[in-house]
Design a protein with these regions (language model features):
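Hydrophobic faces of well-ordered beta-strands that scaffold small-molecule active sites
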Residues: 14-18, 43-45, 94-98, 123-125, ...
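Catalytic beta/alpha-barrel core
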Residues: 68-70, 119-132, 146-154, 160, ...
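Catalytic cores of alpha/beta
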Residues: 25-36, 154-164, 206, 210-226
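Glycine-rich phosphate-binding active-site loops on the catalytic face of alpha/beta enzymes
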Residues: 40-52, 120-124, 128-132, 174-180, ...
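N-terminal amphipathic alpha-helix/helix-capping segment at the start of soluble metabolic enzymes
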Residues: 1-15, 79-85
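Glycine/Thr-rich beta-alpha phosphate-binding loop at enzyme active sites
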Residues: 59, 159-198
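Active-site beta->alpha loop and helix N-cap motifs at the rims of alpha/beta catalytic domains
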Residues: 47-49, 60-125
Length: 234
């Protein structure tokens, strides 16, 4: 069983998001430890980027604040290394949320080599088309890193295509558009998850727009877990 899938074996998974470097990398490390002690089953760590096209204003502003501190990708890898070592080592899966540009600029092989060395279990790359997953995925898999697929409201044919190739877990996008808190989630998540489960037994976690405990509970009822980002970052 993959490290990521293992996070879903204890029940419904709670997956918080944090933007690395926002308010300083030392605080990011501290917040992640607090999240894990509070019961997070996996933590999604956002690598700040100047053009985060999938993000709403809250996470965009967090990225801008992080970049203004001068945080670099190497600093984030060093932080993850600290989290993974010592008597108080964090053992839950840690996944990066990033974009193609930072990976390519840093160097794909170098990026995934360091992911393997420090203990990153997976990456989420929202601006990578499914059709282009192959090359990046092969490099990631060589280093034991899973590339998480996103599924938004779309045709069953496309859901089938993505679900059959998924690894780790599937990130089910609750609302079209960018991330951010929504007062109401109108998408029929239950039917999307049921469609996904026709083609794979990979866990499905719902994200984008979850802003209240009630919403998180509702999404977890029809899936395997809930991802909460903007509400935590705010």
């Amino acid at each position: 069983m993959s490290k990521i899938k293992d996070a879903f074996t204890k029940g419904k998974a709670f997956i918080p998001f944090i933007s690395a470097g926002d308010h300083g990398i030392e605080n990011t490390e501290r917040y992640i430890r607090v999240m894990v002690k509070a019961g997070a089953d996996m933590v999604e760590i956002g690598i700040p980027f100047s053009d985060p096209t999938a993000e709403g204003p809250v996470i965009q502003e967090a990225s801008t604040r992080a970049l203004s501190t001068g945080v670099k990708i190497h600093d984030i890898f060093d932080m993850v290394h600290r989290l993974r070592t010592g008597d108080d080592a964090v053992t839950v899966p840690l996944v990066f949320m990033t974009y193609l540009n930072p990976i390519y600029v840093f160097g794909r092989e170098k990026f995934f080599t360091l992911c393997e060395e420090v203990g990153i279990s997976g990456v989420i790359v929202p601006d990578m088309p499914f059709e282009e997953k192959g090359e990046l995925g092969s490099i990631a898999n060589k280093h034991g890193v899973e590339v998480v697929s996103l599924i938004a409201p779309t045709s069953e044919n496309r859901i089938e295509m993505i679900a059959k190739e998924a690894e780790g877990f599937i990130y089910c996008v609750s609302s079209l558009g960018v991330t951010g808190m929504r007062s109401e989630i109108k998408t029929d998540i239950k039917s999307i998850v049921e469609t996904i489960r026709k083609y794979t037994d990979i866990p499905v976690a719902v994200g984008f727009g979850i802003s209240t405990p009630d919403q998180a509970e509702a999404m977890a009822r029809v899936s395997d877990g809930a991802i909460v980002g903007s509400a935590i970052v705010k």
